[in-house]
């Protein structure tokens, strides 16, 4: 009598099988091959493994069987979900504030005067220097000093308090998604992006450009774990000497349980850094999940509003990021658009 072979691939509980199946039934025979094909959907970023594989052999009547577990694993990484920042965002005034361009002493597109040269066919008439033409009788054009790409610094709060709320809706989930989306956007603009993630230690990705840099950043964000309680002031003291003047700072945090936040951001502002804070509120996540009563919510919301007002008074661009708000909306709100 033929025997039936069942092969089953173990899938992590947080994943949902979107297409296909993670098991197959087949008749056992010589030199037979088969494939298990399925698509999984994972709502949470992180490192995962498929496996082990369970193999069960049973008779045609299903009365007897033998089962063995094969320790075969496939490891893979789930990046944070990213929001596309559309062309309308690029045309707004928000990214102009983020340019942070510096001159590199070469002619090219830019804002500062570099030199005069003779007019060539195809040059813009707007570039003609009419005063030089009046003096020399020759058409001369202004060359500009080429602007280099920006240095963008993204800081992600990964302290233990960042995981307050449901596992799929908390400040760390929103912050890592925002950091990934912003990194993709700025790198796509050929800017230089660096990322700092801090919790029980300070993990940094040095500033760089290109697709490889995006992969490095996404890998760090995928592995971010909520733990520890390093104050923001420690992070600021460590990175301040290494940040170029004019680099925009984007800080992603729920702003909770850290008495150093105001002074730390004041240090940035005192050195004339442009600071944007997007703050996913753990209060909203807890209240929506009915883990916080109305009275407690109102008291803590008032304290949070006072803190946000104090940071605005320092010249920090800040947005209280509500759970259902798109990143582009939150960013535009922080910048006052």
Could you say what each language-model-derived stretch is?
Residues 137, 159, 202, 228, ...:
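Residue-level detector of flexible, active-site-proximal loop/helix-junction positions
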Residues 89, 243-249, 255-337:
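Von Willebrand factor type A / integrin I
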């Amino acid at each position: 009598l033929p025997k039936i072979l069942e092969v089953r691939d173990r899938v992590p509980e947080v994943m949902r099988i979107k297409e296909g199946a993670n098991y197959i039934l087949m008749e056992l025979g010589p030199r037979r091959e088969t494939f298990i094909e399925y698509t999984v959907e994972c709502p949470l970023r992180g490192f995962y493994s498929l496996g082990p594989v369970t193999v069960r052999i049973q008779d045609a009547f299903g009365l007897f069987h033998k089962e063995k577990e094969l320790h075969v694993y496939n490891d893979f990484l789930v990046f944070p979900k990213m929001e596309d920042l559309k062309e309308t965002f690029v045309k707004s005034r928000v990214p102009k504030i983020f340019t942070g361009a510096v001159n590199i002493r070469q002619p090219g597109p830019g804002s500062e005067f570099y030199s005069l040269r003779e007019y060539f066919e195809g040059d813009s008439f707007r570039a003609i220097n009419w005063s030089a033409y009046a003096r020399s009788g020759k058409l001369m054009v202004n060359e500009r000093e080429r602007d280099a790409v920006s240095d963008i610094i993204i800081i992600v709060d990964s302290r233990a308090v960042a995981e307050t709320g449901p596992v799929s809706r908390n400040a760390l989930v929103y912050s890592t998604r925002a950091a990934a989306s912003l990194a993709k956007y700025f790198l796509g603009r050929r800017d230089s992006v660096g990322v700092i993630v801090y919790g029980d230690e300070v993990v940094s990705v040095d500033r760089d450009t290109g697709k490889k840099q995006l992969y490095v950043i996404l890998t760090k964000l995928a592995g971010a774990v909520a733990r520890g309680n390093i104050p923001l002031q420690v992070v600021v003291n460590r990175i301040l000497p290494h940040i170029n003047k004019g680099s925009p700072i984007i800080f992603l945090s729920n702003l909770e349980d850290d008495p150093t936040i105001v002074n730390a951001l004041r240090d940035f502002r005192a050195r004339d850094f442009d600071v944007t804070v997007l703050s996913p509120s753990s209060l909203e996540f807890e209240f929506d999940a009915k883990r916080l009563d109305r009275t407690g919510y109102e008291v803590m919301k008032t304290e949070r509003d006072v803190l946000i007002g104090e940071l605005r008074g320092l010249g920090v661009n800040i947005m209280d990021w509500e759970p259902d708000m798109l990143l582009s909306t939150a960013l535009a709100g922080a910048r006052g658009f």
